[in-house]
Curated annotation (Swiss-Prot):
Catalyzes the phosphorylation of the position 2 hydroxy group of 4-diphosphocytidyl-2C-methyl-D-erythritol. It is an enzyme of class 2 (transferase). The active site is at 11, 139. It comes from Methylorubrum extorquens (strain CM4 / NCIMB 13688). Transmembrane segments: none annotated. Gene3D superfamilies: 3.30.230.10, GHMP kinase, C-terminal domain (3.30.70.890). Its EC number is 2.7.1.148. ATP binds at residues 97-107. The keyword Transferase applies. It catalyses: 4-CDP-2-C-methyl-D-erythritol + ATP = 4-CDP-2-C-methyl-D-erythritol 2-phosphate + ADP + H(+). Signal peptide: none annotated. This is 4-diphosphocytidyl-2-C-methyl-D-erythritol kinase.
Amino acid sequence: MSVLTTRAPAKINLTLHILGRRPGDGYHALESLVAFADVADTLELVPGPDLTLDISGPTAGPAGPLDDNLVLRAARHLAAGVDGLRLGAFRLHKQLPVAAGIGGGSSDAAAALRLLAELNGLALDHPAVIAAARATGADVPVCLDPRARMMRGAGEEIGPVLGLASLPAVLVNPGVPVSTAPVFKALGLAVGQRLDGAELPVVGASLNADAVLAVITPARNDLEAPALTVAPVIGEALALLRAQAGCRLARMSGSGATVFAIFSDDGAAETAAAAIRTAEPGWWVEPTRLA
């Protein structure tokens, strides 16, 4: 069989409400409207007898030890759940920043599961594929089929595809990796404690851009304030986005440090991205669309 290829797009939390910390397992209960960008890593699978991984690309350096990479972890979980699973050599081209709040590693892991499922004739809703996604990480299940939807619980409750309008946007990462743990520590919730705040209204399917903005603008990312104490440069990135013509909303994604802004149109997004690259040449800046 020839080489199999798929994209692993950036996952953007348009909203991220932390509802509390669950008494049973200590995980943070969340509610998030997730969309995916058209900027992505690329993953290839060359069928073969051995499970291997090679990483290249501009952000390959910070991706961590190969053996601990989520691509291999996901593949091993699936192999443990499916007798005789056909394997092969993965080639990952990293374009997305690491530890950036956009689910790069989780999206890579989900991409690995998609390729292995294709190679082995498994549906993405096959119990072994779902189990492998959940075992690999909380954000992996929502990345299996990267289209806008709600996620709840600790990430394991995935809603139906919403078919939202594609939104012109700019992603900005100020070049500072931010681990999730210190951000949740700064949030400071004790086990069993709930966080006050309005829940997101029901998000309907097939909303146009104005309707999507009407839903997400009153919402929030509850990790933004604690992340600003961990990496204050996030605030600078948000301010720079908000200062651009045509910016309709700017917010942090995940636990940071990537921030995003929704713009009035693609031209405004591209102009803003160019201006930010000029102002901050060391930052990762990408005009994109979210859907």
